[in-house]
Amino acid sequence: MNFHQQFKFLNSISTHASKAIIDLHILIMRCDNRVSLSEQHHTQDIIDLLPWTDGNSKQAYYQMSVAKVRDVLANHEVEDLLQQISDVLNNQITREQLEFLTTMIVSADHVFTDAEAEVVEMLMAMQ
């Protein structure tokens, strides 16, 4: 099964859910202040697959989300952001799909940090 087929379930989500997935990606990648090149490439691959009907580009949203996540991490509001993401994704993708997605994010560079594990665990507890 190729990469595109693995993420076929993303075709049916809303733009709102696409934004939540971008936020989640950035949060997981930056929660330990370490963003590897393979994580960046992997994130770009998934972002390219996300449905998008917003007037602004995905790239513009991505940049805005990076700034938002930086604030969230600085103010220790990770749980609040995860709750928002969970609420949005709850009706859009199944828990199994979310688990698959988060696993793919954190294993992109084969370095699974405690900080990443904590974020994923908190999100799964909300679903």
Task: Give the role of each language-model region.
Residues 1-127:
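Small-residue-enriched hydrophobic alpha-helices in membranes
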